[in-house]
């Protein structure tokens, strides 16, 4: 069950409207690593979790907080679009608005009535393919660290793209929360790795072709990666290096398709 409160988690009001910054913020809302991806990933992982209650609760806590971040960014975008120009009358009144109108996301006015959308800045819709919920919490926690890292990186870049103190205030809060989320997911990952092992999944090592499991194969014309040779991996084994990987699989010969498929291949 979710219960909404009308108060935002943190301030989300700019000093002035800025439709171009509104477009940029769409990446943190509807982009691959944005808050919608975090919200849906963590909630899905939490709902799928049947193990230790602390991990389930951690995921649901954080997924629900991401809802608040979606709300904050959507609100900020709405404020940034207040009084934004969108028609020829605006341009006639003030020709200097041409640059602003050229930099705006046309979908903000055309599709969403000068409101936020679940798209990235170029209008590509957010999609569920960005979400990870594998049922394996070691893998999922690793994804979560990456998601928070990418999100924080993008927020850092957005911070440098504006001098609006209201926008920056919200971004400072998001930076801090993404610090917390990185750290908590790293801690959960470490605990789960101690229990299940470093490699995901940890119960297949007995059947894999282990002679290939710690070989760094040189598939480029550089040799810089040879520096890893002899170093100890996190599982305690040493890396070896293969200068010239060999083709061991032979030449495939697949029979032609059924004539009804019309695969005319010469």
Curated annotation (Swiss-Prot):
Positions of Mn(2+) 2 binding: 66, 148, 181
Co-factor requirement: Ca(2+); Mn(2+)
Residues involved in Ca(2+) binding: 57, 61, 218, 220, 222
Origin: domain of life: Bacteria
Annotated SUPFAM superfamilies: Ferritin-like
Cross-referenced InterPro entries: Ferritin-like, Ferritin-like_SF, Mn_catalase, Mn_catalase_C, Mn_catalase_dom
Keywords: Calcium, Manganese, Metal-binding, Oxidoreductase, Peroxidase
Main function: Catalyzes the decomposition of hydrogen peroxide into water and oxygen.
Family: Belongs to the manganese catalase family.
Protein name: Manganese catalase
């Amino acid at each position: 069950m979710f219960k909404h409160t009308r108060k935002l988690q943190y301030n989300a009001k700019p000093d002035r409207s800025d439709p171009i910054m509104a477009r940029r913020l769409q990446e943190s809302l509807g982009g691959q690593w944005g808050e919608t991806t975090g919200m849906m990933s963590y909630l899905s992982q939490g709902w799928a979790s049947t193990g230790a209650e602390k991990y389930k609760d951690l995921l649901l806590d954080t997924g629900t907080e991401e809802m608040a971040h979606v709300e904050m960014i959507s609100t900020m975008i709405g404020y940034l679009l207040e009084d934004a120009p969108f028609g020829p009358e605006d341009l006639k009144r003030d020709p200097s608005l041409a640059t602003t109108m050229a930099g705006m996301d046309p979908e903000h006015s055309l599709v969403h009535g000068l409101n936020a959308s679940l798209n990235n800045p170029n209008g590509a819709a957010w999609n569920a393919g960005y979400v990870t919920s594998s049922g394996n919490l070691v893998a999922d926690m690793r994804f979560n660290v990456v998601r928070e890292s990418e999100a924080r990186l993008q927020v850092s870049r957005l911070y440098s793209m504006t001098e609006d103190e209201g926008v920056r205030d919200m971004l400072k809060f998001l930076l801090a929360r993404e610090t917390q989320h990185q750290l908590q997911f790293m801690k959960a990952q470490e605990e789960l790795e101690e229990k299940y092992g470093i490699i995901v999944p940890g119960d297949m090592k007995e059947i894999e072709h282990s002679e290939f499991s710690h070989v760094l194969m040189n598939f480029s014309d550089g040799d810089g990666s040879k520096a890893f040779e002899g170093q100890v991996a996190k599982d305690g084994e040493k890396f070896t290096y293969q200068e010239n990987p060999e083709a061991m699989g032979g030449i495939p010969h697949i029979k032609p398709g059924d004539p009804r498929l019309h695969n005319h291949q010469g």
